[in-house]
Amino acid sequence: MPDRLFLFAGYDQDCIIDDAVIYYVKTLSKYGDVILCMDCNCPKKEIDKIKKYTIHTIASRHGEYDFGSYKRCFQYATNKNILKNYDYMYLVNDSVFGPTINIRQTLKNIEKTSTDAASMIVSKHKTHTFMESWFIRLNKKVFLSDWFSNFINSVEKEENKFDITIKY
C-alpha cells in the first residue's frame, strides 16, 4: 500500500468536531496518516474525540479558510521532517460528507493517473478548468518541490471568500 499523508482542513462555527468529520478522518486514517487543522478554537474535549485518528491535530482560529489549514498541516509535516516518508499527499476538507463509498478504490483510481496532481472532481468555469480543492492528490515530485512549499506557505488571510477562491 502506498504511503499517504492526508492534510485535512475543517471548520465549525461552534468549535466542535462533529460526527461527520470524525467519520471522515477515521476512514482516511485506515489508508494513511492524517494531520487535522480546524480553523476554530476547539476545546480540548473536542480534540480528544479525534486525536486517536490523527498524527497531529491543530485547532486554532486563523481565518485563512481551507488553504490556511493546509498550510499549517504542511508546516507541521515539514517541521517534523516527515514529508519524505510519503508517496502521496492529499488536501482534503470537510466541505463534503463522506466517504459514502469504499474510499480504497477511489484512492487506487486517483493514484494510477500519470499526472503530478489529480482530484476527485475537475470543474469547468467560463474561462478555465480547475480541480475542486476538497480532495486533491499530489505526488512526491509536487509536495517536496520548492514551488509547492513557497505556494502553500504564501497563503494569507484575504478580504473575502471570493478572493480566496480566485487566488488559491
Predicted regions and their residues:
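N-terminal anchoring/stem segment of glycosyltransferases
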Residues: M1-Y65, Q75-K84, Y88
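Alpha-helical elements of Rossmann-like donor-binding domains used by nucleotide-donor carbohydrate transfer enzymes
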Residues: Y23, R72, Q105-N109
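Conserved donor-nucleotide/metal-binding helix-loop-beta segment in metal-dependent transferases, i.e.
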Residues: G98-H128
